[in-house]
Regions:
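Charged, alpha-helix-forming regions
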Residues: 1-229
């Protein structure tokens, strides 16, 4: 599969400022299988990490980063991971925080391999709609590590996507000027990166369930897209 950048300008679809965030290439290339709500939690972590690096003090009581001996505690509104959605009794949020606390991410390059859990001890205060959870130190460190490069993308655009595969492609393609070739199979292939080693094993199924859906959303919301060959 080859992904080629499209540079045509497209409207964002709303009047909100589209804040740029810088995501460590470690996170961009990490191998994991998250759903959309879990991915939105990660996007918020990236946003928190950027503000931390910039030395921007978060002034409201609804957003906090509190260092601990083994990571950081994050406080944020549950609404930060929703897409203008109704979440009765926090059902979607509880499911997302619970499932993400049971998952991890893998990163590997020529020098290192590591696996880490992501978060633990998520809590939602029902009266205020505030979520509090702990982020493991390797995850926070990876979010702050730009030594291997970074991807710059627009946060509101990323939060628009309904498919997690659209999100992953958007991260990979954002800021890409030259054509980017990403194979389907292999250690750096899409199947491995997206954690789909046992799903959509037939190429046509992978194209229909992953590539076609991602391309449709990218064409609608993003200035970047790809073609599959």
């Amino acid at each position: 599969m080859a992904a080629y950048v499209s540079t045509e300008d497209k409207p964002l679809g709303d009047n909100l400022p589209n804040k740029a965030v810088f995501q460590s290439y470690i996170w961009t290339c990490a191998k994991y299988d998250f759903n959309v709500y879990e991915k939105r939690i990660i996007y918020r972590l990236v946003e928190f990490a950027q503000r931390w690096l910039e030395g921007v003090r978060i002034k409201d009581h609804m957003h906090k980063v509190e260092p601990t001996n083994c990571g950081v505690n994050i406080t944020m509104p549950v609404a930060d991971i929703l897409r203008d959605e109704d979440d009765h009794n926090y059902t979607k949020a509880k499911a997302a925080f619970t499932s993400l606390s049971k998952k991890g991410a893998t990163y590997e390059d020529d020098n290192i391999w590591f696996y880490t859990a992501i978060i633990e001890h998520p809590k939602i205060e029902k009266n205020t709609g505030i979520a509090i959870f702990h982020v493991y130190e390797p995850v926070w460190r990876a979010a702050l590590d730009f030594t291997k490069g970074y991807r710059k993308y627009e946060l509101i655009t990323a939060m628009k996507f309904k498919s997690v595969y659209s999100m992953r492609f958007y991260e990979l393609l954002s800021g890409q000027i030259k054509p980017l070739y990403v194979p389907l199979e292999g250690p750096d292939g899409l199947r491995e990166r997206f954690g789909l080693q046992t799903k959509y094993e037939r190429v046509n199924d992978f194209k229909r369930k992953v590539l076609d859906i991602a391309k449709k959303e990218l064409d609608e919301y993003s200035p970047y897209s790809f073609v599959a060959k």
